[in-house]
Amino acid sequence: MKRKLSRRELFKNVGAAGAVTLLNVPLGAQQGGNGRQSSPFQQILDHSSKELLAEHEQYLVKIQTAKLIATFDRRYGSLSSIRRKNDELGTNYIGNETNTPGVNPSDSRWTGDVVSTVWRLLGDWRAAKIGLHDIFKMSGEWRRELSGQSGDIRHVEFRDNLFQVRYDGQSANEHGIRSYRLEMSFHPAEDHSLLWDIEIENVTPGVLEVGELGFPLMVNDDYAELYYEPGGQSAISTINNVDFVRTPLRQKLIHEQKVIVHHFIGGHSSYALVQRPLGDAPFLLLHPTNQDTSFECSYKDQDSAFSEHAEGWRGPDILAIHSRATKIRRGWTRNPWVNGHTSVVLQPGEKKNYQMRFVFVDSYEAIREELYQAGNLGIRVLPSMVVQEDTEVLVELQSKSEIDKISFLSDNIKVASRKRSGDKTLLNLSFRKRGQKSIKLHYGDGRWTNLHFYCIEDIETLLKARGKFIVEREFYDNPEDPYHRHHGFLPFDHRVGSAYTDSEEVWEVGDSDEAGFSEPLFLAEKNLYFPREEEVDVLETYVNDCLFKYIQNPTTFEVRASLYWKERLPSSPWGNWTKERSEATWRTYNYVHPANIYHALYRIGKRYGLLKRRKAEDYLRMSYHTCIAWFHAGPWKHIGMMEGSNAIHILEDIKREGWQQEYETLLQEMKECDDVFVSDPYPYSSELIIDQTAHEQVYFFTRYFGDQEKNRKTVQVLKALRGGNQPAWFRYGNDKRGDVCCWYNASLNGMALLSAFEDSGDQDAFLKGYAGVMSVMRNVLPDGMGFNYFICTPGVFSSDPPTTFESGTGLWGFLKSAKSYILNDKTFGLVGCGCRVETTGQAITVIPKDGLRKRMRFTEEKLDLECTQGEFKKVIFDRADGSLELQLEDSTGNVKSAAITLRGLEKGEYKLSYGNSSKRSPSDGTLVVNVAMSEARRVRIEPLRATKS
């Protein structure tokens, strides 16, 4: 029988044995798979994660329903755990001092605590003088009152399945509760959910302004806990996370025993979705239920000592009903958060009652139903919340009553249509002029919910502007640069309006790493769709004078860490790399970017003939050798890389060129990598403790090699990263990565989810994928400046820092993913996503507006159109006879011949008509059409004899 191990024993026992295994056991044995050697590590990994985390806790009492088990800690009056009943893994969704070691209970922020700030009156506030000659004097000052510092007045009772906590009297502690009586209870509801009731009563003799009233939601999300050992080294450095003996175990524990929480904070329809990163339903939902409970802001409590000794964990999120005092105390007055900040004023003896509800839901779609049943709004937005000017966005609002009023909180908002259909209000919105576009929905006798969109300019124009900006503002021309960055690319700082050459993190300005490859990566891929001779010339100059001369060794194909370096001082931080450190070539991630740059140049040469320094085949061979170096370099060679999926396209182009030996060699390297993905239960690790980078490559490799089960599991994990489609532009379709939004993972993982949708028809995967891909375009300004990401933290809420940094990877993902989708929606009928759709009888006219106008999918027919040379201006598809009319154009002036590929056709013979020519062509389901651009204004494709493929 397997011996049970505690969490700390687990890592202690791996210890030295793990280190020996890392050094001496072949990769396959470390990572798993058939024939793996038995080791102390493997014996531990073979335990179920439930056994591994079995802990005994005291002071606990329990409430059970048919669906959940909740335990409460009498010492703190807090919720200690929520588990699904009969859950095979036994995961605790709530954070406590066992799964979040190092917290300080004397200043607690448990789930069940209350965080408040009240206005301490020192005089008559109504007598304030604010006239012309008056001297204004504040009537008092803010004072924090915290249940976590009110243990001296805390009373806890448990009886009859009711857990009650009362704070009665005045706490003697500095930040204890004194101004109000607080009473809370947790009890099961008839529907097997858990209700949390809160009542506050003003016990002062005067009016009481509560400027902050927030509820910590402490969940079991301290991932860093798995990387620390008492008495051992203080931390496992995130940039040296190469302990592959422990990595599968850590990933197993993270995905099965830790949770991820997604928040929608927008009024009465707010919610928190807590789920395992594994992505398996049911999920734990927390949401408001009554008239007075509406969340307006969410933030960390920076004043708390609760988490200061919990290494790597920033503390729980505070879900705030009122946050005016928080705004003032933290200096957000010039940068308030999206919903505004309010106070509540209580007269002496006046009470307020709040209620929240914990319930397990069986699907993401079920979230909307739970909110609807609570009298709030079930919200669905199609297709995204980052929206181009003058394109429609569709909003479905499921509610028990009609929406009373829609208030515009921003300029240039248009409601094109509004109608009530059953229990749903359907809106068709559009926007003009860049910026956040917010609406407030009023309903249900005083309830409200805010929706925040973001309007951007025409994407095609933005992409072309970005390419021009890179060439004109970021291409570095300095033959005297001592670091050999001449004809490389530098990042751009929007604050000073200039590229910059120095950074405390040398790789940021060193022409390698994600920051250094960002600009040429985007520029190369962009020119594959919109070729511009000047930009291609710059790319070839960059390769010749910088990349394939100084960054990459042209003989060994090794890629160095940075061209830039610094002489270290006693006070130098880690990022001040020495010359020796900058010359290191072991970071696997640095190989994928140049491989993709070379590959794009190969395709540019093949399609447009714009190359001057090398032949197209030369670039493909450089890409191939860089891929081989990638799969042999450094410790992360068999971990998913950002943009790693493109190895599949490189491989296919090598095959088309007839390079059989190179094809077989690269195929074998990729297959070995995929074997690790399949054998490792959770192959989603990286150089960081927790990351969203590996998933894209894992998804596409397992799909390519036919590993259906791991591919399905990866889709499930990808969807968990995005949660319940939280309807705010900075969360919709975005992976939960703290408060970082619209980053590269939004588009790269979105690309995978869109592929999953095309394979399966999963509408939820479509929404998560499409919205994520669109979100990165918010980062590009009309002049071509491109931010790296957006920070949605209250008080920040901007692109911080406002630099380009790694922006190119996210835009690369957009370019790979952009497509016009024509689909039948269950609510809105025929919908164009990334395009405008018009119908006449059985004929569908599509005018693409997806940014590229290169790809199109009729989802019901599973018909794909791709124009690799030229652009679709208009497409007419007649469902009655299966004919297609393609109207093409070239916005670049560099396309000599239009190239179109159709996939998903019925087998048979087709008549092609264009210009003054026509011909017949057989199709096995795929049809390739090449037409001189001068004759491509109108191409007609008609089936003559067709059979179902």
Language-model segments: which ranges?
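Acidic-aromatic substrate-binding/catalytic surfaces of carbohydrate-active enzymes
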Residues: P40-F41, H56-N173, L226, G232-N241, ...
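Catalytic cores of extracellular degradative/oxidative enzymes
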Residues: I470-L754
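Carbohydrate-binding surface patches
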Residues: G808, W812-G908, T926-R940
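Acidic (Asp/Glu-rich), glycine- and aromatic
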Residues: R75, G176-Y180, A189-S269, R447, ...
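Low-complexity, Pro/Ser/Thr- and charge-rich linker/hinge segments at domain boundaries
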Residues: D222-Y228, E369-T391, W448-P491
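N-terminal export signals
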Residues: E9-Q30
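Short Pro-Gly-centered flexible turn/kink motifs
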Residues: K67, V344-D362, E935-E942
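C-terminal beta-strand-rich structural cap/linker in extracellular carbohydrate-active enzymes
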Residues: S363-E365, P922-S949
